[in-house]
Amino acid sequence: GEVTVVAPSGNQSGTGCSISFRKSVNVNQVPSRVDGVNCFAVRGTPADSVILGSKYILEEDVDVVISGINPGFNTSRNMFISGTFGAAIIASALGMRACAFSMDAVDPVDDFTVANVITAITNELICSDTPPGSLFNVNFPTIPVGGIKGVEGCAPARSELKMTVDLQSD
């Protein structure tokens, strides 16, 4: 199949499912690091990227939307403020299969192991009878290369959403 990347042009941590309402959103085609892959940078949120990619950039139906991979877990209630998971939620709401991928920390060596697992999961989503609108959230712990033994499904935990605020005066 054909792969197209439509992603925010900068970090969008904490944007959740937000869209750029009453604001301009710019899209630019950018050079790809992979032959045959078209890449677009969106000056907007991850959700904006999904909407623009699926409705305006791509001419065919989307088989699956992959969001991420980003450093830091998107587990429990934290996933609801995650831009990575937010993009997957919007894709699912638009009727596409979607999966958000996150990992505890970025490690160039472990990234190759994770890439193989992401490829396998993506292929399963495309080739299986996974219904349109299905939504998945996959988090990889920091483990040695080759340490991934499988994928386990679970419901999100119901932990407290803890946030800190650094108050400053003008």
Describe the residue ranges of each PLM region.
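A cross-family phosphate/adenosyl-ligand binding-site feature
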Residues: E2-Y56, E60-D61
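Short beta-strand segments
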Residues: A7-P8, S67-N70, F101-S102, V138-P141
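Short glycine-rich anion-binding loops that position phosphate/pyrophosphate groups of nucleotides
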Residues: N11, T45-P46, N70-F73, I143
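Alpha-helix C-terminal capping segments
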Residues: G53-E59, G86-R97
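Short, Asp-centered acidic motifs that coordinate Mg2+ and/or phosphate
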Residues: V64
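Glycine/threonine-rich flexible loop motifs
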Residues: F73-S82
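Glycine-rich phosphate/pyrophosphate-binding loops
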Residues: S92-V114
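Electrostatically charged, flexible surface regions
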Residues: T113-D170
